[in-house]
Protein backbone atom coordinates (compact mmCIF):
# COMPACT_ATOMS: atom_id res chain seq x y z
CA UNK A 1 0.00 0.00 0.00
CA UNK A 2 1.11 3.52 -0.72
CA UNK A 3 1.47 6.31 1.78
CA UNK A 4 -1.24 8.90 1.12
CA UNK A 5 -2.30 12.22 2.50
CA UNK A 6 -5.88 13.10 3.27
CA UNK A 7 -7.67 16.17 4.56
CA UNK A 8 -9.76 16.27 7.72
CA UNK A 9 -11.94 18.87 9.40
CA UNK A 10 -12.99 18.55 13.01
CA UNK A 11 -16.25 20.49 12.74
CA UNK A 12 -17.69 23.17 15.08
CA UNK A 13 -19.90 20.73 17.00
CA UNK A 14 -16.95 18.52 17.95
CA UNK A 15 -14.70 21.50 18.77
CA UNK A 16 -17.45 22.85 21.05
CA UNK A 17 -17.62 19.48 22.84
CA UNK A 18 -13.85 19.70 23.50
CA UNK A 19 -13.11 16.37 21.79
CA UNK A 20 -10.34 17.53 19.42
CA UNK A 21 -7.78 15.44 21.29
CA UNK A 22 -9.99 12.35 21.42
CA UNK A 23 -10.59 12.51 17.66
CA UNK A 24 -6.92 13.14 16.86
CA UNK A 25 -5.93 10.22 19.11
CA UNK A 26 -8.16 7.95 17.03
CA UNK A 27 -6.36 9.04 13.86
CA UNK A 28 -2.97 8.44 15.47
CA UNK A 29 -3.96 5.11 17.02
CA UNK A 30 -4.98 3.94 13.53
CA UNK A 31 -1.53 4.76 12.14
CA UNK A 32 -2.27 8.17 10.66
CA UNK A 33 0.14 11.02 11.38
CA UNK A 34 -0.91 14.67 11.67
CA UNK A 35 1.44 16.52 9.31
CA UNK A 36 -0.39 19.87 9.38
CA UNK A 37 -3.03 21.34 11.68
CA UNK A 38 -4.77 24.68 12.27
CA UNK A 39 -7.52 25.80 14.61
CA UNK A 40 -9.44 28.46 12.73
CA UNK A 41 -12.73 30.28 12.39
CA UNK A 42 -13.96 29.91 8.81
CA UNK A 43 -15.27 33.02 7.11
CA UNK A 44 -18.46 32.78 5.07
CA UNK A 45 -16.40 33.13 1.89
CA UNK A 46 -14.02 30.32 2.93
CA UNK A 47 -16.91 27.97 3.73
CA UNK A 48 -18.73 28.83 0.50
CA UNK A 49 -15.57 28.25 -1.52
CA UNK A 50 -14.72 24.98 0.19
CA UNK A 51 -18.24 23.59 -0.29
CA UNK A 52 -18.81 25.19 -3.74
CA UNK A 53 -19.70 21.80 -5.26
CA UNK A 54 -22.86 21.84 -3.09
CA UNK A 55 -23.87 25.45 -3.90
CA UNK A 56 -26.96 24.46 -5.91
CA UNK A 57 -28.26 22.09 -3.24
CA UNK A 58 -30.97 23.05 -0.77
CA UNK A 59 -28.82 22.51 2.30
CA UNK A 60 -25.95 24.79 1.16
CA UNK A 61 -26.95 27.83 3.24
CA UNK A 62 -27.38 25.74 6.39
CA UNK A 63 -24.05 24.00 5.76
CA UNK A 64 -22.21 27.31 5.42
CA UNK A 65 -23.94 28.69 8.52
CA UNK A 66 -22.98 25.60 10.53
CA UNK A 67 -19.37 25.56 9.36
CA UNK A 68 -18.99 29.23 10.33
CA UNK A 69 -20.79 28.84 13.68
CA UNK A 70 -17.59 28.19 15.61
CA UNK A 71 -13.96 27.24 15.21
CA UNK A 72 -12.85 24.16 13.28
CA UNK A 73 -9.61 22.19 13.15
CA UNK A 74 -8.29 21.61 9.64
CA UNK A 75 -5.69 18.85 9.38
CA UNK A 76 -3.60 16.93 6.92
CA UNK A 77 -3.25 13.27 7.84
CA UNK A 78 -0.63 10.96 6.33
CA UNK A 79 -0.30 7.20 6.36
CA UNK A 80 -0.85 3.94 4.51
CA UNK A 81 -4.16 4.09 2.64
CA UNK A 82 -4.96 7.30 4.56
CA UNK A 83 -8.13 8.23 2.65
CA UNK A 84 -9.92 4.91 3.18
CA UNK A 85 -8.59 4.56 6.72
CA UNK A 86 -9.88 8.02 7.69
CA UNK A 87 -13.28 7.36 6.13
CA UNK A 88 -13.55 4.08 8.04
CA UNK A 89 -12.67 5.85 11.30
CA UNK A 90 -15.27 8.57 10.64
CA UNK A 91 -18.16 6.20 9.98
CA UNK A 92 -21.33 6.87 7.99
CA UNK A 93 -22.32 10.50 7.34
CA UNK A 94 -25.49 9.96 9.38
CA UNK A 95 -24.36 9.11 12.92
CA UNK A 96 -27.49 6.98 13.40
CA UNK A 97 -26.13 4.70 10.65
CA UNK A 98 -22.48 4.85 11.77
CA UNK A 99 -20.92 1.69 13.17
CA UNK A 100 -20.32 1.64 16.93
CA UNK A 101 -16.88 2.94 17.83
CA UNK A 102 -16.59 5.28 14.85
CA UNK A 103 -16.02 8.99 15.36
CA UNK A 104 -19.49 9.94 14.18
CA UNK A 105 -21.22 7.26 16.25
CA UNK A 106 -19.41 8.49 19.35
CA UNK A 107 -19.28 12.28 18.88
CA UNK A 108 -21.77 13.45 16.22
CA UNK A 109 -25.17 14.95 16.99
CA UNK A 110 -26.93 14.68 13.63
CA UNK A 111 -26.42 14.23 9.91
CA UNK A 112 -25.66 17.97 9.76
CA UNK A 113 -23.57 18.31 12.94
CA UNK A 114 -21.60 15.15 12.23
CA UNK A 115 -18.27 15.99 13.91
CA UNK A 116 -15.83 15.47 11.04
CA UNK A 117 -15.19 15.80 7.32
CA UNK A 118 -12.73 13.70 5.36
CA UNK A 119 -11.64 13.64 1.73
CA UNK A 120 -13.32 10.98 -0.39
CA UNK A 121 -10.66 10.63 -3.12
CA UNK A 122 -7.05 11.49 -3.93
CA UNK A 123 -8.21 14.37 -6.14
CA UNK A 124 -10.43 15.75 -3.39
CA UNK A 125 -7.63 15.39 -0.83
CA UNK A 126 -5.19 17.34 -3.01
CA UNK A 127 -7.75 20.09 -3.66
CA UNK A 128 -8.87 20.34 -0.03
CA UNK A 129 -5.33 20.34 1.39
CA UNK A 130 -4.30 23.11 -1.03
CA UNK A 131 -7.40 25.13 -0.09
CA UNK A 132 -6.24 25.52 3.52
CA UNK A 133 -2.48 24.86 3.52
CA UNK A 134 0.51 26.18 1.61
CA UNK A 135 2.94 23.43 0.63
CA UNK A 136 5.43 24.81 3.17
CA UNK A 137 2.91 24.27 5.99
CA UNK A 138 2.69 20.50 5.45
CA UNK A 139 5.53 18.53 7.00
CA UNK A 140 6.77 14.98 6.80
CA UNK A 141 7.24 12.97 9.98
Swiss-Prot record:
This is Nucleoside diphosphate kinase. The active site is at 117 (pros-phosphohistidine intermediate). It is an enzyme of class 2 (transferase). InterPro entries: NDK-like_dom, NDK-like_dom_sf, Nucleoside_diP_kinase, Nucleoside_diP_kinase_AS. The keyword Magnesium applies. ATP binds at residues 11, 59, 87, 93, 104, 114. It is found in: Cytoplasm. One of its GO terms (molecular function) is metal ion binding. One of its GO terms (biological process) is UTP biosynthetic process. Its cofactor is Mg(2+). Signal peptide: none annotated. Belongs to the NDK family. Its EC number is 2.7.4.6. It holds the Pfam family NDK. It catalyses: a 2'-deoxyribonucleoside 5'-diphosphate + ATP = a 2'-deoxyribonucleoside 5'-triphosphate + ADP; a ribonucleoside 5'-diphosphate + ATP = a ribonucleoside 5'-triphosphate + ADP. Major role in the synthesis of nucleoside triphosphates other than ATP. The ATP gamma phosphate is transferred to the NDP beta phosphate via a ping-pong mechanism, using a phosphorylated active-site intermediate.
